[in-house]
Regions:
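Metal-dependent phosphoester/phosphodiester hydrolase catalytic core
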Residues: 1-221
């Protein structure tokens, strides 16, 4: 969230005061404020849900919702908070984000309480994640508990001809390869997120690349 007294406009558009985040953090890039508690996430949801056009749309049409990155943390993944700076353990933040999403987004997903009405308390600690499985998932218990506090990926069937599959691209995501030291060997920063096909195949396969014998080093160009 940007505050109009700090950033009056962005892309020639007026910044409105949708709310002030209590006990939040500030991005290492620009003057973005982001929530770290359930009260902070509630401020964000209340702010954007005050939009009369969105209210009218919600009243008229059904929505099928799944979260993206900003429902938790801009550059975050699993229960790791990252917003223009170094990654930090954020298991309590992930649970808070999941709780607020559950409270404000219409979706039939099961919370820790086992109910569709209340989220339920879930105690976790912000602990560094030091061990990972072969797919890049941190196996630290608080990380797994935070991630699984709310599972939003699901499938819906409409009639005989439509199966709608909603995927979660962030809760189980591995490390961003563009953050790695020496990444310039396989990555051109002037083309953000663009890898050569050979590098992309190797990155997707991970430890299983080349029959389980990936090269010690990849080069680009």
């Amino acid at each position: 969230v940007e505050y109009p007294d700090e950033v009056p406009t962005r892309y020639d558009r007026t910044i409105y005061d949708v709310g002030r985040i209590p006990d939040g953090g500030q991005s290492g890039v620009g003057k973005f404020h982001y929530p770290l508690t359930v009260d902070g996430y509630r401020v964000v949801y209340k702010g954007y849900l005050a939009d009369p056009d969105l209210q009218d749309a919600r009243a008229r049409w059904p929505f099928v919702a799944i979260w993206d990155n900003h429902e938790f943390s801009w550059q975050g993944r699993q229960s790791i908070v990252q917003a223009g700076g170094a990654p930090q353990p954020g298991q309590t933040v992930k649970v808070a984000a999941n709780q607020a999403w559950f409270e404000y987004i219409p979706a039939r997903v099961k919370a820790p309480s086992g109910s569709l009405d209340t989220f339920g308390a879930l105690a976790v600690k912000n602990v560094p994640i030091e061990k990972w499985d072969d797919g890049g998932l941190g196996i630290e218990p608080n990380n797994l508990k935070a991630i699984n506090s709310l599972i939003a990926y699901r499938s819906l069937r409409y009639g005989r001809h439509l199966d709608l599959i909603l995927t979660d691209q962030h809760s189980f995501c591995g490390a961003d390869p563009t953050d790695a030291e020496g990444v310039a060997k396989i990555y051109d920063p002037s083309f953000n997120g663009m890898f050569s096909e050979r590098a992309m195949i190797a990155l997707d396969a991970g430890r299983t690349f080349n029959g389980g014998k990936p090269p010690a080093e990849l080069t680009f160009g």
